[in-house]
Amino acid sequence: MLSVGFNIAINATTQGVPKIIESLFPNLPNFIAHLLATIVLVIVLAKLVYKPYKQMIEKQRQKITEVLSDAIEKQTQANIKIKQANSLLEEAKTESVSIINTARVDAEIQKNKIIDNANLQAKNIQSYAQNSIKQEKIKAQLEIKNTIVNLAINSAEKILSKEIDKNTNKKLIEEFIKDLD
């Protein structure tokens, strides 16, 4: 039974094969002409279009490669310049800190000089004032002494009525004043 069904299927398919082939290839000379024309067209297109297309693609590839290598080179240069700029910036920061520290030290030195100078001037003024006071005190003491001596001489002259001369009287008064000091 199986063989009968299989034979029927084979007969049906073998009868239909020439029809399918006839449907696909209705005219064998036309098919061969079309096939040859297609092959010729593919060869001509390959020669005329593919080679220039391939050359154009290669040129584009070269341009892209050049652009990429140029971009890489420029990126490398930019990175180098960025590093240089960063190092210059660091140097500038270091230098500015150094300048600020130097300025602070100089300002501190200048401040100390000004303070020392002011203290020295104050001491000079104070010692001058003390010397002036001492001189004025000595001068005042001398004036008081002379006034006392003169008063004592005048009083003694009146009291003694001219019995003792002026030099002896003066010596007595000076001894009296020395004893008071």
UniProtKB/Swiss-Prot annotation:
Task: Enumerate the Pfam families for this protein.
Answer: ATP-synt_B
Protein's name according to its UniProt entry:
ATP synthase subunit b
Do the record's keywords include Nucleotide-binding? no
Q: Which residues cross the membrane?
A: 24-44
Q: Which taxonomic lineage does the organism of this UniProt entry have? A: Bacteria, Bacillati, Mycoplasmatota, Mollicutes, Mycoplasmataceae
User: Which keywords appear in this protein's UniProt record, sorted alphabetically?
Assistant: ATP synthesis, Cell membrane, CF(0), Hydrogen ion transport, Ion transport, Membrane, Transmembrane, Transmembrane helix, Transport
- Tell me the HAMAP family matching this sequence: ATP_synth_b_bprime (MF_01398)
User: Which organism does this sequence originate in?
Assistant: Mycoplasma capricolum subsp. capricolum (strain California kid / ATCC 27343 / NCTC 10154)
Family membership noted in the UniProt record: Belongs to the ATPase B chain family.
Location in the cell:
Cell membrane
Q: What is its main location?
A: membrane
